[in-house]
Structures are given as C-alpha cells and as structure tokens.
C-alpha cells in the first residue's frame, strides 16, 4: 500500500495508507463460529470460508484509507497508539461518530458532537490526555476527512 506522511496534532508523523482495489491480497479462513471470551463453549465442527481482511473491514474500497493512530486521546473509545484506523470518506458523519478531521493544518481523530446550537465539537475520549474539546470557529481551517469504521491492532 502506498504510504504518505501526514502530521498528527502533536507534531509526530503518522502514516496514511490508501487501499488498492486491484492489489492481490492474502486470503484468511473465516471460521463459522463465535469464540467465547468468558466461559468456554463446547467444541463443534465448523465450516470455513476464505475472506480477506479488506472484505471484512472495508465497505467502500475507493473511498477508504488506513491511518495509524498517534497519541492517547481516544483510549476510552478503544483506540490506542499504533492502531490502524479504517477511515471511510463516503460515510456521512453524525453526532457520536468517531471522525478523522483536519483542524488548523493538523489531522486528529475525535468523537464528533454537536452543541445545543448545532455547532461542531470534537471530543477526546481520555480525560487524562490533556487534549480539550476542539470547537472550530468560522474562518478556521476545518474539514472532516472521514468516519472511522473499524481498526486493526497487532498484539
């Protein structure tokens, strides 16, 4: 995947990866079962089908980018440093969506909220991060680039 650098809000460089719809991808077996994360369930015979991760994670390949998360402002939303965020640029952002936004020349990932007057606010999801609510004002550079629809993480 081609990668282009972009600046995150703290000045560090994050990677942005574009998905290539014609690229060959490896297939992984998707087993037709649910794995208990609490008490184990009895084993059984399960069917498997082959899928690619992009088939599971990407709804609009031509409008989707992957962005590496930097910082800790979204940990209570389950987004951690180094996570690869699936960002769909065609999904309509709504209040409550987690969005990738360009604000004053920096990219940031925050929870989109509307104040009582319908004005946009971008909320962090970690009160300990030191990042406050962002409230774009008229005349400031601001654009929602897309909605975060999923993520991938390595252990």
Short names for language-model regions:
Residues 103, 108-139:
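Aromatic- and Lys/Arg-enriched surface recognition patch
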Residues 75-76, 89:
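Short, conserved secondary-structure segments in the cores of folded domains
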Residues 82-83, 97:
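Structural motif
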């Amino acid at each position: 995947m081609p990668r282009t650098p972009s600046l995150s809000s703290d000045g560090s460089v994050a990677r942005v990866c574009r998905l290539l719809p014609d690229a060959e991808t490896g297939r992984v077996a998707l087993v037709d079962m649910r794995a208990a994360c609490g008490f184990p369930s009895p084993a059984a015979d399960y069917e498997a089908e082959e899928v690619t991760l992009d088939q599971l994670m990407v709804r609009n390949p031509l409008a989707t980018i992957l962005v590496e998360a930097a910082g800790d402002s979204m940990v209570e939303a389950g987004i951690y440093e180094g996570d690869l965020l699936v960002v769909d640029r065609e999904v309509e952002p709504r209040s409550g969506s987690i969005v990738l936004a360009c604000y004053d020349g920096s990219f940031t990932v925050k929870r989109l909220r509307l104040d009582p007057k319908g004005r946009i606010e971008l909320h962090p999801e970690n009160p300990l991060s030191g990042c406050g609510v962002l409230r774009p004002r008229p005349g400031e550079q601001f654009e929602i680039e897309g909605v975060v629809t999923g993520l991938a993480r390595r252990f």
